[in-house]
């Protein structure tokens, strides 16, 4: 078994990735492996941006957001000839094992390399929390806290002016950021891809909330639902005659110092990944499920849809309107 191991982060960055990089490197060294850092995701393999980790300041990066080795989306990696080129380059260097940190695209890329003979272990690194068979992904907790802090501040000013705020959060096609931020902040109205409401329906609910004497209303919505957030807010104001503002939380959700939870989660997952590599395992995804670090076949993860939380969305909508 080759002692050279590649480490890469791919797709959208997530707070906690640096903790994963640091602990993967330190764990690899402690087990006698020779870790290599691959910069800018899968594109870094093709561009040969591969350096020995010993030449990189991997200590002390766990407290920083983003990913110190860069990340990118590389749709060309879906082509088999590009995958073959990646295997060729890794083999030339002597890298036989690869740890990938990212979301579903990263998992799919890793699975393809696994099928071509590279030993691959995957860690879930995405703020969207949209990886199957894990309760939490690296970065989700930090992003959630960023959203909660933002909505809490909006609530203060909304209360002062008796306003309605429509807040759009990330999540791609997963509603977890919207759902759990609504739970944490008491957002009166929650709109997700499983609970889409028209401006007329939202306006009626807004009026009902103010009629109960509430000084403000927060509408939390997951991205990729509304064609235009400002127009949606303007329509609510037109229908209710209540001052309504909109806010897209945006890429601040991706940044910031990772929470202690994300740092520890990434560290534990990294240590488990190196344990598996030391056992010459491949094609596995690390998860945090039911309070424990577990493993699943990557094939099973990439072939399953995101878990459903539809009932909880409806329940939170009902509870928060009281």
From Swiss-Prot:
One of its GO terms (biological process) is canonical glycolysis. Pathway: Carbohydrate degradation; glycolysis; D-glyceraldehyde 3-phosphate and glycerone phosphate from D-glucose: step 3/4. Its EC number is 2.7.1.11. ATP binds at residues 12, 73-74, 103-106. Gene3D superfamilies: 3.40.50.450, Phosphofructokinase domain. It is found in: Cytoplasm. ADP binds at residues 155, 186-188, 212, 214-216. It catalyses: beta-D-fructose 6-phosphate + ATP = beta-D-fructose 1,6-bisphosphate + ADP + H(+). It comes from the Bacteria. Mg(2+) binds at residue 104. InterPro entries: ATP_PFK, ATP_PFK_prok-type, PFKA_ATP_prok, Phosphofructokinase_CS, Phosphofructokinase_dom, PKF_sf. The active site is at 128 (proton acceptor). GO terms for molecular function: 6-phosphofructokinase activity; AMP binding; ATP binding; fructose-6-phosphate binding; identical protein binding; metal ion binding; monosaccharide binding. Belongs to the phosphofructokinase type A (PFKA) family. ATP-dependent PFK group I subfamily. Prokaryotic clade 'B1' sub-subfamily. HAMAP family: Phosphofructokinase_I_B1 (MF_00339). Homotetramer. This is ATP-dependent 6-phosphofructokinase. It comes from Mesomycoplasma hyopneumoniae (strain 7448). The gene is pfkA.
């Amino acid at each position: 078994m080759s002692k050279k191991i590649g480490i890469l982060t791919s797709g959208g960055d997530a707070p906690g990735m640096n903790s994963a990089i640091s602990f993967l490197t330190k764990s690899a060294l402690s087990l006698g492996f020779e870790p290599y850092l691959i910069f800018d995701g899968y594109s870094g393999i093709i561009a040969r941006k591969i350096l020995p980790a010993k030449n990189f300041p991997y200590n002390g990066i766990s407290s920083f957001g983003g990913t110190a080795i860069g990340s990118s989306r590389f749709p060309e990696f879906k082509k088999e000839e590009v995958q073959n080129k990646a295997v060729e380059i890794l083999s030339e260097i002597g890298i036989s094992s690869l740890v990938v940190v990212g979301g579903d695209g990263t998992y799919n890329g890793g699975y393809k390399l696994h099928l071509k003979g590279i030993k691959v272990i995957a860690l879930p690194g995405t703020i969207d929390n949209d990886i199957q068979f894990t309760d939490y992904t690296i970065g989700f907790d930090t992003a959630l806290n960023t959203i909660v802090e933002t909505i809490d501040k909006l609530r203060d000013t909304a209360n002062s002016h008796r306003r309605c705020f429509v807040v759009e959060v990330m999540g791609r096609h997963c509603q977890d950021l919207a759902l759990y931020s609504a739970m944490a902040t008491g957002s009166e109205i929650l709109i997700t891809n499983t609970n889409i409401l028209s401006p007329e329906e939202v306006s009626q609910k807004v009026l009902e909330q103010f009629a109960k004497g509430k000084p403000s209303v927060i509408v939390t919505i997951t991205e990729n639902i509304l064609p235009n957030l400002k127009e949606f807010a303007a329509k609510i104001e037109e229908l209710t005659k209540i001052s309504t503002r909109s806010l897209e939380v945006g890429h601040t959700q991706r940044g910031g110092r990772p929470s202690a939870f994300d740092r520890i989660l990434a560290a534990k997952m990294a240590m488990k990944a190196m344990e598996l590599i030391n056992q010459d395992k491949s094609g596995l995804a690390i998860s945090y499920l039911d309070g424990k670090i577990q493993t699943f076949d990557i094939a099973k993860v990439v072939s399953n849809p995101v878990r459903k939380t539809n009932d909880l969305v409806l329940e939170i909508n009902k509870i928060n309107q009281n």
